[in-house]
Amino acid sequence: MGRMHAPGKGLSQSALPYRRSVPTWLKLTSDDVKEQIFKLAKKGLTPSQIGVILRDSHGVAQVRFVTGNKILRILKSKGLAPDLPEDLYHLIKKAVAVRKHLERNRKDKDAKFRLILIESRIHRLARYYKTKRVLAPNWKYXSSTASALVA
């Protein structure tokens, strides 16, 4: 799938393993992996950061193959899921950083244009999450309160 506001085609992607079974050399059980997920979530890590740590440090290629559920679903079952979806959170964080840059560099027209693109992606993603009932129907992105959301 191509990029929304860039000319790139976005062809690079990670390859999923062909077999969906748990590798024989993996000694962690489903409960061990879940405990590790809860421990990392309590430290304040996002689901993708948890997945990277489990992959690199514990040898769990896909949490879904071991536990039967994705990381976010496991976190939701315990009530540890983040209140904002991760992709929306990172877009808001990027918009706050660009806005902070614009306060120091008022004449940066390109940054002003990129901020408009970032905020349009935020609005589009928020509209999607409202239809999927992940966000409250009255949730609204306001640039004045955005820095409080990501702090």
From Swiss-Prot:
GO terms for biological process: translation. The keyword Cell cycle does not apply. Its main location: cytoplasm. Gene3D superfamilies: 4.10.860.130, S15/NS1, RNA-binding. One of its GO terms (molecular function) is structural constituent of ribosome. Keywords: Cytoplasm, Ribonucleoprotein, Ribosomal protein. SUPFAM superfamilies: S15/NS1 RNA-binding domain. The keyword Ribonucleoprotein applies. GO terms for cellular component: cytosolic small ribosomal subunit; nucleolus. It is found in: Cytoplasm. Component of the small ribosomal subunit. The ribosome is a large ribonucleoprotein complex responsible for the synthesis of proteins in the cell. Component of the small ribosomal subunit. This is Small ribosomal subunit protein uS15. It comes from Gillichthys mirabilis. The gene is rps13.
